[in-house]
Amino acid sequence: MSTFVNDTVEDAIKTPELDQPFEALGLKDDEYARIKEILGRRPTDAELTVYSVMWSEHCSYKSSKVHLRYFGETTTEEMASKILAGIGENAGVVDIGDGNAVTFRVESHNHPSFVEPHQGAATGIGGIVRDIMAMGARPIAVMDQLRFGALDNPDTQRVLPGVVDGISHYGNCLGLPNIGGETVFDDSYAGNPLVNALCVGTLKVEDLKLAFASGTGNKVILFGSRTGLDGIGGVSVLGSASFEEGEERKLPAVQVGDPFAEKVLIECCLELYKAGVVVGIQDLGGGGLACATSELAAAGDGGMRVNLDNVPLRAENMSAAEILASESQERMCAVVTPENVERFLEICAKWDVTCAEIGEVTDEKDRYVVVHNGEVVIDAPPSTIDEGPVYNRPVARPENQDELQLEGEIARPVDVEDIKAAWLKLVASPALASRAFITEQYDRYVRGNTVQAKNANAGVLRIDEETNRGVAISADASGRYTKLEPNTGAQLALAEAYRNVVSTGARPVAVTNCLNFGSPENAGVMWQFKEAVHGLADGSKLLGIPVSGGNVSFYNQTGDEPILPTPVVGVLGVLDNVEQSIGNVLPSEDNDLYLLGETFDEFGGSIWQQVSGAGLNGLPPVVDLLNEQRLADLFVGSDLFAASHDLSEGGLGQTLAELAIHADKGMDVDLSQIHPSLFTSLFAESASRIVVATNRGEELEKRAAELGVPVFKLGRTNDSAVIAVKGADVEFNISVEELREAWTNTLPEAFGHAVGANAVVG
């Protein structure tokens, strides 16, 4: 038993005027006053801890709720019918037919990854995997979305190698393939990198599990790793003498992950589900046991009583506040009927997973009682803990937005040598260069069900070995576009992820997101956020695919300067037969090349604008989601295409270069019909475009015309190892080997000798 002296509910009643460090825990004056009003007294130390954790921006979404409701308002009945579990659950779950369901979610672990890159990123993977486990699913793959400062920034040199190592270590040890992602470099992320992790899992429809505690007398069981002192510095639980006896205890603010413990926990959970001994389940992530138990209680039909004396600990003399707020990894919390407790414990013992009965569901509706050292340290309504405050913060379009949207001058090469130099500069730029330095550290094919991953438009996975049914997943974002016009920027991210999935032949069925923004106390940031949410919600409605869930990460800034607003959008698609999915590697035999979609002189927020040294300005490309739907109608179920590659950053030039490099093929292309300007044809970033390879051109042209998809014949592939380009009045050749050398060397040269990589911020 702990020797820590508790601040009990009885003490709180006797000492109403005791000063408490609520500000150090992130609570505002009015929030502290509201807690006292709810309880009818001052909170105990443990209650103050729980409310501060659960009312944090991370757990409560207090600044974003008013805007996130728009997702629900724009979801039609038809869209909702596809979702088995949606916004508010640990992850979205989609019914894909034949009794199968897929669950997926993306979440941020930004600030921990800056402080301690390896563990921050590793536990980001661990946390999102447990979200998927908590839905009753087997995790089958991960993806990542990474943002760093400039390539030569010392912080980037320190953080990136550690982040990549953390992701690869944890994911590889779990045996989960990393099937895709995106890495972006921009000055705005210096000092505040973004580490967003996505996980996808599969389950049978009838095996779906939800996070709620119901059934009076049912037991609450904590299982997994023991609870320690790691991961609680971030919520400032021990920021004052009121919460700590002595200063010798040094607490890591970043959680420490054990992927092998999580691997065992996955198998243990799946056997528990199969045995039918789980009523409700919740993973322990941000907010730890405080979050898991109070959320279970709030979602249930009764109350809950928790005894912290039964929690397996790995540190001595832990206070109630420490036990509740600890974010030790690899832990789950389940609700189990009394008759199934013995079987539950047997299964945990089989897998050598530590477990303990720590509480029970009571018949006292909306009452959450926590006991430590035999004393009551929390007695509060769980609904008030879980719901948190709701803020409608000021929203104001930034004063400089009009000026930002004015189109500035950019260099526009005309002669052959300048165009070739521009092309090589683009493919070698940090924005577009090969990510093999990163992705080769990930195992993409473990488990044997990865169909597409390396250099693919979208990750493609087989989920049913008998039918070859599978899914395609892509996640995309553009902070540059979103900075210029947040509504359009979010829709462009949605359009690109949708198009990536479509280009494999998959039918898009659902959306997830992770919205990374600056401080919500900045009215300009809140305007960006609101506009992005509306753009994403309206776009999803137009495409007819529901937003199944998401995550919000605020306070991403260095000093007063926020990051580029970065709404990461993930799209899930379904393939009836993954063996018929369309890849993006040109076949060895020669094929005709076609460009689908129109090209306009659109360079606002483009990579050429960035690489050429022009400031970020102008308007992003126009997005017409009906054009994306037309492309979907052309691709889904079609056997016309030998290969496909969507166009996005870097435009047609980047796509042609990657196609040639990956297949070691040459090509003759005539761009005179694409746009009068060869420069625009190559480097503009207009949306709704895909390059395809086919030898059934007449059929393609006919079908595209029927659907209203603009189609332009570019030329044909060959074995020359040269891209021969023809414009309206310009012709030139560029060597594939020259492009390859430019494309492949940038990241290895930058990080081959990264000094201080993965150093911890003190």
From Swiss-Prot:
Signal peptide: none annotated. HAMAP family: PurL_2. InterPro entries: PRibForGlyAmidine_synth_PurL (IPR010074), PurL_linker (IPR041609), PurM-like_C_dom (IPR010918), PurM-like_C_sf (IPR036676), PurM-like_N (IPR016188), PurM-like_N_sf (IPR036921). It comes from Corynebacterium glutamicum (strain R). The gene is purL. Belongs to the FGAMS family. ATP binds at Y61, R105, N513, G550. The keyword Nucleotidyltransferase does not apply. GO terms for biological process: 'de novo' IMP biosynthetic process. This is Phosphoribosylformylglycinamidine synthase subunit PurL. PANTHER family: PHOSPHORIBOSYLFORMYLGLYCINAMIDINE SYNTHASE SUBUNIT PURL.
